[in-house]
Amino acid sequence: MNRFDVWLVMKNIEKGRVVDNIGLCAILSPDELNDLPNLIVAPMTREFEDLPSRIEFEFEKNKGFIMLDQLRSIEKNNFIKKMGELESKVQPQLCSCLQEFFAL
């Protein structure tokens, strides 16, 4: 499990607005934190919403959006199957958006 890997994940159910319980997520945790029991992920969707925290991507010839406004920490035992890796041109966009998102 590495940063920018795409996994099929059983997401934690939360109250309120919840993205589907099982779905694709991009790992955002730095690889240096791989020894921890949880990883920080961003869910992925095909539904467009005009938000600055949504990063457009293409994965397996399908377009979609990484939802940085839906970040969550997921236990490793909820990771079902590795599906691939985010394309390299999206990775710096993610990092830049996260830096802006969490700017103090």
Regions found by a protein language model. Give the residues of each.
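Conserved functional hotspots at enzyme active or ligand-binding sites that engage polyanionic ligands
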Residues: 1-104
